[in-house]
Design a protein with these regions (language model features):
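Membrane-proximal alpha-helical anchors
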Residues: 1-69, 73-80
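An amphipathic alpha-helical interaction surface
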Residues: 3, 48-49, 67-69, 74-161
């Protein structure tokens, strides 16, 4: 009878151990999802009194911070220095632009937005705004970032347009 009690106790203890390990695995998977960042870009445009502004914004719409590991701009498919790419794309309008280049190890918090590029220019019609927007569309952005759990993700504007 004592052997039966001992074996039963051992089986119950092993079941409790297996259940605890399984619960730990499930909890860890949940924790990873609960701090997953999600980066995306969008463009805003406004025109008022023959003056227009186009802005390209980056937003972290995820549930945790995005740790920037690489920030790279491409012009017509070629990797370029950010300032050179913007100057090449915008030409004379580059002098009327404000830009933000996110450095490595920058931590973009949850729900944070950054204006990556803002261009202000005279525009008597919507066609002028559209022509500047086409120039900006020649720029592409690749951002490699990680979550608090160091899971690497890549934002690629060429795939997300």
């Amino acid at each position: 009878m004592e052997i039966l009690v001992s074996i039963s106790s051992l089986i119950i203890a092993l079941c409790a151990l297996v259940f605890t390990i399984w619960q730990t695995y499930i909890q860890r998977a949940h924790n990873r999802l609960s701090v997953k960042p999600h980066l995306f870009t969008f463009t805003t445009k406004d025109r008022n009194n023959n003056l227009a502004r186009l802005q390209v914004l980056l937003k972290n719409n995820g549930l945790g911070p995005a740790f920037i590991n690489k920030f790279q701009i491409y012009y017509k498919g070629q990797e370029c220095e950010p300032d050179a790419a913007i100057n090449a794309a915008l030409g004379e309008w580059a002098k009327n632009s404000i830009r933000t280049i996110l450095g490595e190890e920058y931590a973009m918090s949850e729900k944070e937005s950054e204006v990556l590029l803002s261009v202000t220019f005279p525009a008597e019609s919507d066609e002028v705004v559209e022509s500047i927007e086409k120039k900006i569309d020649q720029l592409d952005l690749i951002i490699e970032y990680s979550s608090a759990y160091e899971k690497m993700e890549t934002y690629d504007s060429r795939k997300n347009s």
